[in-house]
Regions:
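A short, well-structured juxtamembrane/interface segment
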Residues: 3-24
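Short, basic, glycine/proline-bearing loop/turn elements
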Residues: 2, 69-75, 103-106
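Non-catalytic C-terminal accessory region of glycerolipid acyltransferases
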Residues: 83-186
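Residue-level "edge-of-site" marker
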Residues: 18, 79, 137
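A generic structural signal for alpha->beta connector loops
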Residues: 9-11, 48, 68, 95, ...
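Structural motif corresponding to alpha-helix initiation and N-cap regions
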Residues: 14-17, 59, 82-85
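Catalytic core of membrane glycerolipid acyltransferases/transacylases, capturing the structured
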Residues: 7, 22-79
Length: 186
């Protein structure tokens, strides 16, 4: 229902949703520009999606909602999040979809992307599931004419190190964001 309201209100364009398989474990990873990004990603598939989100959402007045929807609480101040990582692994090992932003926070800067954390690539490598990048561009405005999500083909990281995998994910998403803005990746 929330997705239906979102689509009506924001009028987003969705490209590449067929990249998300109808079954099996998947890690979705993309840029984070707005609090509604997870809802936007959710309208790309009929499958339930488990989202990694800052733990403060679980501690808020709406915490019950985030727990009910299978959101995974992440402590952004911690160096590591073994509980969140284990929970995400459990969902993936059960054949579910996990969505996270490697930026780990919303990007309010002039930079096209913030530096990536390693959670997405580590989860994908640990489970052997597809790592599917996406890029969100445009404005969250009523009946927007330019809000768009582009779901890209899975990236093959099987023969890459964690650092190389993260760099490939970063470059893939950055390339799509730059293309959408008509500029060259730098």
């Amino acid at each position: 229902m929330l997705g239906t309201i979102f689509v009506w209100w924001y009028n987003p364009t969705i490209i590449g949703k067929e990249q998300i398989p109808h079954e099996g474990a998947v890690v979705l990873a993309g840029n984070h520009k707005h609090a509604f990004d997870p809802i936007f990603v959710g309208v790309c598939t009929k499958r339930p999606i488990h989202i990694l989100a800052k733990k403060e959402l679980h501690d808020s007045v709406f915490g019950w909602f985030f727990r009910l929807t299978g959101t995974i609480a992440v402590d952004l101040e911690a160096e590591r999040n073994p509980k969140a990582f284990a929970e995400a692994l459990t969902y993936l090992n059960d054949g579910n979809v996990v969505n996270l932003s490697p930026e780990a926070e919303r990007n309010y800067t002039e930079h096209i992307l913030l530096p990536f954390k390693f959670g997405a690539v580590v989860l994908a490598k640990r489970t052997g599931c597809p790592l599917i990048p996406y890029a969100i561009t445009g404005d969250y405005r009523f009946r927007s004419r330019n809000l768009k999500i582009t779901v890209l083909p899975p990236i093959d990281i099987s023969d890459l190190s964690i650092d190389q995998s993260n760099e490939k994910l970063f470059d893939t998403i950055k390339g799509q964001l730059c293309a959408a803005q008509g500029r060259e990746p730098s």
